[in-house]
Amino acid sequence: MKLENHNLAVASLKTQRISAFKARLVAVLLKGKKVSDALAILAHTKKKASPIFTKLINSAVANAINNHGFEHSNLIIKAAIVNEGPTLKRFRPRAKGAASQILKRTSHFKVILVSQNGGESQNQEYQETEKNLVTKSPENTQSGALSQQSQAEQPQNDPENGVDSQLSAKTNSTTTAKKTDLADNSTKNDATNTVLAQEKEVK
């Protein structure tokens, strides 16, 4: 189970051989109590769930001290949760070949501890890590998207410009070729005219 608040310490036990109804009778006594008071209550409560909760609270305290750096005297039980687990089905023989069903119930336990001081140092570290993870603001992402769109549009327009330049180059080459052909034809006509004029003079 993931918790957003990093000021919490959690410990859990699963498939304990006790019904959820009987375990909740003890869980009600622990909510909102200090850890020292809760352990004292469990020591004087003669219920099957008492040693289970004692073991679970000690585990949660160890997690709070080692993982979060909390002090033992500042820990409070925020929640003591008991959920139903899988049920084992057994049968008891009865008279005349009959059998009756036996339901052996199990339960899942969870204890959540919180510090009275709120763990300000842990909150600051968590906020710093969040700031490091946030690399771009929404405005930067929008500007980046626009720049990507413009970059994507530029290569699409470039081929069209290239085609236009190729067409203009082809037209220019054809016009220059036509001009050179006309110039060659004019020079040939001038040469033939001069030859004819010389022949007439000779005659």
Swiss-Prot record:
<dbReference type="GO" id="GO:0022625">
    <property type="term" value="C:cytosolic large ribosomal subunit"/>
</dbReference>
<dbReference type="Pfam" id="PF00237">
    <property type="entry name" value="Ribosomal_L22"/>
</dbReference>
<comment type="similarity">
    <text>Belongs to the universal ribosomal protein uL22 family.</text>
</comment>
<feature type="region of interest" description="Disordered">
    <location>
        <begin position="138"/>
        <end position="203"/>
    </location>
</feature>
<dbReference type="InterPro" id="IPR036394">
    <property type="entry name" value="Ribosomal_uL22_sf"/>
</dbReference>
<comment type="function">
    <text>This protein binds specifically to 23S rRNA; its binding is stimulated by other ribosomal proteins, e.g. L4, L17, and L20. It is important during the early stages of 50S assembly. It makes multiple contacts with different domains of the 23S rRNA in the assembled 50S subunit and ribosome.</text>
</comment>
<feature type="compositionally biased region" description="Polar residues">
    <location>
        <begin position="183"/>
        <end position="196"/>
    </location>
</feature>
<comment type="function">
    <text>The globular domain of the protein is located near the polypeptide exit tunnel on the outside of the subunit, while an extended beta-hairpin is found that lines the wall of the exit tunnel in the center of the 70S ribosome.</text>
</comment>
<dbReference type="InterPro" id="IPR001063">
    <property type="entry name" value="Ribosomal_uL22"/>
</dbReference>
<dbReference type="GO" id="GO:0003735">
    <property type="term" value="F:structural constituent of ribosome"/>
</dbReference>
<dbReference type="GO" id="GO:0006412">
    <property type="term" value="P:translation"/>
</dbReference>
<dbReference type="GO" id="GO:0019843">
    <property type="term" value="F:rRNA binding"/>
</dbReference>
<feature type="compositionally biased region" description="Low complexity">
    <location>
        <begin position="168"/>
        <end position="177"/>
    </location>
</feature>
<dbReference type="InterPro" id="IPR005727">
    <property type="entry name" value="Ribosomal_uL22_bac/chlpt-type"/>
</dbReference>
<dbReference type="InterPro" id="IPR047867">
    <property type="entry name" value="Ribosomal_uL22_bac/org-type"/>
</dbReference>
<keyword id="KW-0694">RNA-binding</keyword>
<keyword id="KW-0699">rRNA-binding</keyword>
<feature type="compositionally biased region" description="Polar residues">
    <location>
        <begin position="138"/>
        <end position="167"/>
    </location>
</feature>
<comment type="subunit">
    <text>Part of the 50S ribosomal subunit.</text>
</comment>
<keyword id="KW-0689">Ribosomal protein</keyword>
<protein>
    <recommendedName>
        <fullName>Large ribosomal subunit protein uL22</fullName>
    </recommendedName>
</protein>
<keyword id="KW-0687">Ribonucleoprotein</keyword>
